[in-house]
Amino acid sequence: MNKKTQALIEQYSKSLVEVAIEHKIVEKIQQEVAALIDIFETSELEGVLSSLAVSHDEKQHFVKTLQTSCSTYLVNFLEVIVQNEREALLYPILKSVDQELIKVNGQYPIQITTAVALSPEQKERLFDIAKTKLALPNGQLVEHIDPSIVGGFVVNANNKVIDASVRNQLHQFKMKLK
């Protein structure tokens, strides 16, 4: 993706985020955008909208079908994208909007990687520790299981890492022995 396209994506997403903040509908827009992203990820819609073989009218029809379950502000946003013939960029724009709204809400995904599945109590405890240590007001827990870490856990959130895995401890011990 070139710089011009990336700048367009950022400008469109910034515009929708500003509207959501201004009208105090951040959560509603975030839910609607997440639903649209799910549609893109479970269908061939991105390929259809970026295809040169599909006419502008057909693309417009596909986008209009997306608008049926959207708020007025998101409908207007989608109409602007269609008017400016930016349908091919709709999916990356929606992904960018989603990331920006996560930042606005402070709801960063908190990824916890362990060697084995955690109990609900352990998840809650690690989640609380992660929020405290990484200074996050709130977030969404995303659990990953990776047997290669041997034991312990690794927490990733907002570009910060807490690595309390046995694999990391063994690596640090190995480096000290050198």
From Swiss-Prot:
GO terms for cellular component: plasma membrane; proton-transporting ATP synthase complex. The keyword Hydrolase does not apply. Keywords: ATP synthesis, Cell membrane, CF(1), Hydrogen ion transport, Ion transport, Membrane, Transport. GO terms for molecular function: proton-transporting ATP synthase activity, rotational mechanism. It is a peripheral membrane protein. F-type ATPases have 2 components, F(1) - the catalytic core - and F(0) - the membrane proton channel. F(1) has five subunits: alpha(3), beta(3), gamma(1), delta(1), epsilon(1). F(0) has three main subunits: a(1), b(2) and c(10-14). The alpha and beta chains form an alternating ring which encloses part of the gamma chain. F(1) is attached to F(0) by a central stalk formed by the gamma and epsilon chains, while a peripheral stalk is formed by the delta and b chains. Belongs to the ATPase delta chain family. This is ATP synthase subunit delta. It comes from Streptococcus agalactiae serotype V (strain ATCC BAA-611 / 2603 V/R). The gene is atpH.
